[in-house]
């Protein structure tokens, strides 16, 4: 097993650890951290959001350990780096080091435990091609149940009169709403039903090939994952842009092992991912509005296509408008991870002695384009004209589409050298 900066026989390891093979987590989940839930003892994964492309979980090993940050140290192929964007089909094994004896070699960085990921190497033999394809249907784990409009108005009136205040809704208003005869002036809207779909599809595909001979071996893979969003969208807008939260990710990997001599092994690994996320122009404000909008203030849209302004006594914006009419955000993330290692046996000095040097170079570039607009809004009066038409009052003018953009980037370098001694003397083993 992989322990600290080296590999060790499992029987010789006294530290607490758990191991997992990739065959145990074959599933269409886009988040590798979430896929670990329930598969490794002592590992807790807390998902902060289910938004496509942002659904990575916080991992705790044996609970919350340190006050500021309880995420464990993550090691991929010997280099400290995150692993959530790695395709599960590229992973050979995952090892979790839990207690102090297992993580001591990492010092304070291993205080919250260590997660060690080893990707697949090349194998000796004829080329072997594997193709995996998965589909899944994602649903909300739990949705809050809100009161309908009639219950809401009666409860609001009861709360006000209990405090000695005047009721907010007149009996005639409640009666007109209950009749459903004029839903534009007396709406009763289930905003969750208007905005949210029953579920969304996730698709994941992986193509990999491995092979090689006694001198050189290789593993190469390509993968793609597509997460659809859970919002209902305005079909009229889709011809121009998509406001539904969604995520697409492309991954590639090349691992090669080359025996330069009988005692010298060179390993080269190059991998990367390109992720595109889509979101409404107002982003997180959609959920704030959805959870706070009462059902009787405004309709979704007027019959003439006018967008309703704020409801009476309610300063929150129409959640459907925020999700479908305010433009969109496009976020791109490009990662490249490389590592080169040299393993040299030094048996000519003493049997069992070896040297290993490793260099890693990672780049992470992030760019975001925001194209945001606000539509013109109207307020319908509480009476109709002589011909039965609605009377409108303009409440805000249209703000045309504006574009802003930003980009950031970082690079990380990793260098280490290890001298190991591993030898057996009859029934005794040193290493």
Could you tell me what each predicted segment is?
Residues 75, 132, 354-363, 431:
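Extended hydrophobic secondary-structure segments that form protein cores and membrane-embedded regions
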Residues 96, 179-190, 228-238, 312-324, ...:
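Flexible, solvent-exposed coil segments and beta strand-coil junctions
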Residues 1-252, 266:
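Short, small/polar-rich motifs associated with maturation and membrane association
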Residues 122-127, 214-215, 230, 263, ...:
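Short loop/turn motifs that connect adjacent beta-strands in outer-membrane beta-barrel proteins
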Residues 146-152, 236-242, 283-293, 371-381, ...:
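Flexible, surface-exposed loop regions and adjacent strand-edge segments
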Residues 140-142, 189-223, 227-231, 243-317, ...:
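Flexible loop and strand-edge segments within Gram-negative outer membrane beta-barrel domains
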Residues 1, 417, 421-431:
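Short, intrinsically disordered, charge-balanced linker/junction segments flanking boundaries
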């Amino acid at each position: 097993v992989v322990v600290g900066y080296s590999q060790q026989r499992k029987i010789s390891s006294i530290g607490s650890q758990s191991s997992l093979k990739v065959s145990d987590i074959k599933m269409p989940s886009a988040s590798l951290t979430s896929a670990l839930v329930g598969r490794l003892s002592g590992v807790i994964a807390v998902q902060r959001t289910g938004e496509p492309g942002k659904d990575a979980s916080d991992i705790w090993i044996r609970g919350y350990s340190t006050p500021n940050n309880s995420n464990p140290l993550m090691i991929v192929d010997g280099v400290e780096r995150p692993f959530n964007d790695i395709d599960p089909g590229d992973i050979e094994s995952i090892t979790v080091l839990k207690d102090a004896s297992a993580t001591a070699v990492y010092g304070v960085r291993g205080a919250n435990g260590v997660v060690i990921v080893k990707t697949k190497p090349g194998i000796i033999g004829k080329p072997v091609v594997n193709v995996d394809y998965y589909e899944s249907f994602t649903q909300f784990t739990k949705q809050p149940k809100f009161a309908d409009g009639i219950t809401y108005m009666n409860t609001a009136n009861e709360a006000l009169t209990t405090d000695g205040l005047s009721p907010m809704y007149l009996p005639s208003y409640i009666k007109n709403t209950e009749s459903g005869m004029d839903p534009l002036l007396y709406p009763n809207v289930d905003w969750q039903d208007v905005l949210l779909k029953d579920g969304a599809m996730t698709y994941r595909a992986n193509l990999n090939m491995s092979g090689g001979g006694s001198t050189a071996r290789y593993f190469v893979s390509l993968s793609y994952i597509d997460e659809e969003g859970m919002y209902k969208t305005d079909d009229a807008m889709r011809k121009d842009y998509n406001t539904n939260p969604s995520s697409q990710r492309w991954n590639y990997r090349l691992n090669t092992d080359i025996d330069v001599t009988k005692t010298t092994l060179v390993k080269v690994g190059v991998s990367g991912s390109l992720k595109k996320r889509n979101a409404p122009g107002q982003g997180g404000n959609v959920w704030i509005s959805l959870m706070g909008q009462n059902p009787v203030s405004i309709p979704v849209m007027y019959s003439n296509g006018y967008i309703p302004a704020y409801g009476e006594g309610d300063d929150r914006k129409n959640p459907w408008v925020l999700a479908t009419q305010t433009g969109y955000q496009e976020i791109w993330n490009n990662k490249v991870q490389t590592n080169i290692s040299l393993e040299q046996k030094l048996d000519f000095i003493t049997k069992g002695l070896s040297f290993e040097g490793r260099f890693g170079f990672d780049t992470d570039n992030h760019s975001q384009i925001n194209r945001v607009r606000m539509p013109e809004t109207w307020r319908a009066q509480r009476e109709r004209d002589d011909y039965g038409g609605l009377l409108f009052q303009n409440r805000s003018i249209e703000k045309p589409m504006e574009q802003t953009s930003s980009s950031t980037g970082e690079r990380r370098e990793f260098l280490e050298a290890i001298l190991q001694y591993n030898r057996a003397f009859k029934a005794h083993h040193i290493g």
